[in-house]
Amino acid sequence: MAAATDIGTRDVPSQTGKKPWYSILYVQVLIAILIGIVVGWLFPNLATNDWIKALGDGFIKLIKMVIAPIIFCTVVSGIAHIQNASKVGRVGVKALVYFEIVSTFALLLGLIVGNLAPIGHGLAAKPDAAAVANYVKQAEAQKSVDFVLNIIPDSVVGALARGDILQVLLFAILFGFALMALGERGHRLRDIIDDTAHAVFGVIAIVMKAAPVGAFGAMAFTIGKYGPAALGNLIGLIALFYITAGLFVVIVLGLIARFIGFSIFKFVAYIKDELLIVLGTSSSESALPQLMEKLERLGCSKPVVGLVVPTGYSFNLDGTNIYMTLATLFISQALGVDLSFSQQVTILIVAMLTSKGASGVTGAGFITLAATLSVVNPALVPGMAIVFSIDKFMSEVRALTNITGNGIAAVFVSWWEGELDHDLLQRRLNQQIDPSDVETAVTTG
């Protein structure tokens, strides 16, 4: 029997055989989403009840409850287990290089598609600026200097309580280096942190049993509140964004996967549970802990996963990048504001900065859009009201693209570091190891 290192998995013989289809999590979530769509469509008054909405909101809060401790424990543990401090810096630099290159491709793809399919022309929109005033106000915090300063927490306890990913990540990195510097004296504390991570993953396993309920509530409320009629003439933008995000995953991420030696489609199938949870909640953050655990099972290096994935939730949001450039062009077309080539280059540069302040929570993409428009051309800001009503329908695909991109990023950086178990990856993706036959294990001694 092969034991995993630290927080990992081991293969054990199946005692009961295959699970019945109705007990598989992704099947339950998918059924819940479909039921939510039907209830929201046929019974909108019931679906918009506060208690229905609370089902989705409550599930997201349960997940967010454990994100900060998971990030802290995994990052600290990952760094503390590394003997060479320079390796942490090397992994971080490689991750940032990857993030910038892939993010640029995502932004460029949005610009190219937006120019090739100018569906905003002829809309003759007269937006209500008041509808987006709150988002514009929040966008003020996305200025470059403020963004850098906001990474530094006023209080570690406050950062953990708020679940601020970047602030927790900064403290975890510093704490991990300090623990590594202690050498033998720090091993006992390191083991305690490892055990704490196992306990938190146990909490996640309990919370995930409520995933179908949360997905049902979130989807029913969304359809009940907005309904198919809410799409109106903006259905073209939604469809165009879906297609563009799909092209990015298949072409850009697909080529990266093929370069490493696996199929993007098999990878998507491998993380289907996490994708369906994200689809139901429209928040890529809701699947962060499970994604990290699954990437380790896939053969990715634990330290790499612990550093790349949490960082990617602020620095590698591919779906948000596509959305920002595509939506900016759509708004300018709808308002009759022609953007020159130099202005579009400005959009690209500004979006590369403002997107770094986004996090994997619902609505973050809309806030970063406000920040981008405010810098590029303030006259475009009122046009955000045009896409305000349909933002919810695009946030799901943003989140799906974000989580897929971060998963591929962790695999790529692990490969770049020479710490990707290719044999295990192929066996997992080819389903030669059944996920139902795998249990989490703790290495002792």
UniProtKB/Swiss-Prot annotation:
GO biological process: one example: L-aspartate transmembrane transport
InterPro entries: C4_dicarb_transport, Na-dicarboxylate_symporter, Na-dicarboxylate_symporter_CS, Na:dicarbo_symporter_sf
SUPFAM superfamilies: Proton glutamate symport protein
Subcellular location: Cell inner membrane
A Gene Ontology molecular function term of the record: malate:proton symporter activity
GO cellular component: plasma membrane
Membrane topology of the entry: Multi-pass membrane protein
Chain ranges passing through the membrane: 24-44, 62-82, 96-116, 163-183, 201-221, 237-257, 334-354, 366-386
One Pfam family it belongs to: SDF
Domain of life: Bacteria
Keywords associated with the record: Cell inner membrane, Cell membrane, Membrane, Symport, Transmembrane, Transmembrane helix, Transport
UniProt keyword annotation of Transport present: yes
The keyword Transmembrane helix is assigned to this record: yes
Stated role: Responsible for the transport of dicarboxylates such as succinate, fumarate, and malate from the periplasm across the membrane.
Family recorded in the similarity comment: Belongs to the dicarboxylate/amino acid:cation symporter (DAACS) (TC 2.A.23) family.
Protein name: C4-dicarboxylate transport protein 2
Source species: Bradyrhizobium sp. (strain ORS 278)
Lineage: Bacteria, Pseudomonadati, Pseudomonadota, Alphaproteobacteria, Hyphomicrobiales
Gene: dctA2
